[in-house]
Amino acid sequence: HTNYSYIYQTSLQDASGILNSSREDVLQLRGSATLFKKITDRQNAFFRAWYGSTSNDVSYSGTSPYDNDFSDMYAGAALGYNFSDKMWNVSADVALQWEKNKINDLSVEEFYPLINLSAGFSPSKKHSFRTYFHFGANYPGASEKTPNVLQQNELMYYTGNPNLGLSRQITFNLSYNWMPVNAFSASAFVQYFGEFNLYVPVFNPYNDGKALLRTFETDCDYNRTQIGMSFNYKLLNGNLQLAASPSVSLYRVSGLFDIKRSPFYCNASATYYLGNFYFQASYQTRSLTVHGNRGVIYKDRNFYQMLAGWSRS
């Protein structure tokens, strides 16, 4: 159970304040069962089934009074397999899930697959490879699907879209680690994340053109690819440690928000140990992140840091 209040007051003459209060009662039910089968010392398999439901009873009072019932139900089953030996570690599972999302009398339901694949390969202590793949889906939350119109200030009103459906997600990671000696190690990686049929905010004229109404529409494909490396080097019998992690990210957003960015990022540090004392200098470049379901670009600043400390274990 939660209570929430939002109060907005302006200094304009003859302007009334805005009060949005909500009372929410939430009921959740979840359960799962797993059958495990050991095939050999190196192989095993499993079957898993699950069910869950969430019910939200939300009452709004104040400037924009409403009563809404939200519910989300899901159920699914998965088959999985694992194999491991001295060089290989492989895991895979495939599932089929049903999900139903309901707001008052309007409901949306879908069946969709879930896939997880991972593999690790270590031919020697100096080399190792790792890869991971995931295919799934994501439902918008209650705030993105609410039919209510809530006033935030004189110029902005918020609402949702009850007809929003699933977005599809793909994740892929590939990494390589190299450690020729104890004093030096390096790694290289590629990471990809994509989300398709993603909802984005849309702003339309409202109240005879005197304000804006923000709602959501399904009109976005989001792609992020990151390529990078990392290095660690120990000198002077391990008393001096150098580290660096350069990478580049490729953001591609299509649809209502057409965004393309390719920021470079690097984090570097040097740490020196003198008995129980340590001294560290670090630097990281400005970061840039693109949020697809908001159509927003976030930029951070460069960061410098000097540390000196003492520790004893």
Where do the protein language model's features map onto the residues?
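Exposed, low-structure sequence patches enriched in small/polar residues
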Residues: 1-9, 18-313
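Eukaryotic acidic, serine/threonine-rich low-complexity intrinsically disordered regions
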Residues: 14-16
